[in-house]
Amino acid sequence: MNDYQNYKINHTLSNTNESKQPLIPAATVLLVRDHNSKIEVFMIKRAMKTNFGGAWVFPGGKVDSSDDIKNISKYSPLLNDEEASKRLGIKSGGLIYWIACIRECFEESGILLADNEQKKISKGWFKGSDEEIVNQYKKQLLQGKDVFLELIDKFDLTLSTNEIAYISHWITPKIEKRRYSTRFFIARCPNQLATHDGLEGVESR
């Protein structure tokens, strides 16, 4: 209980005199694993300077324009937009939430939900020089650079969209100034080391 006695969250409340802001599409993922016959979920504590700072959250964030991949079948051969949209209950554009989920998960936790034909990533993280290259891509992503697909192409990967299950849709209450329309997903955490990025996330467990 001591961890929560001084629990504070950085809220930015709405102003009734301001015009309403549109909902921001977002995606987040529950990374779960079996450990000693119990289910564990990875969570990150957001830096106080960020929106909802101080809160413990799942890896995720807003949908980016770069998530709208034109030749998506190359990167997601086992889940297409029609099926993804059907699962979300929308007409089209559903698969973009899966892409955002995977990209944000990698940025915030270092977990890359992707594979190649040898299933190299799901069995363990890159080693040696490959690991250094992957870490450089992550740093560039955190700087706002659009390099996620470069990383995927670099190692000839496909995104594990078919292994990520959609579970819920939450909308931020109207009292908050910045409101999100967030799709929640769940995925088994692969054999990789999950950790916070040290920028938006300052702790993890």
Residue map of PLM features:
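N-terminal leader/linker segments that precede catalytic domains of diphosphate-processing enzymes
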Residues: M1-R205
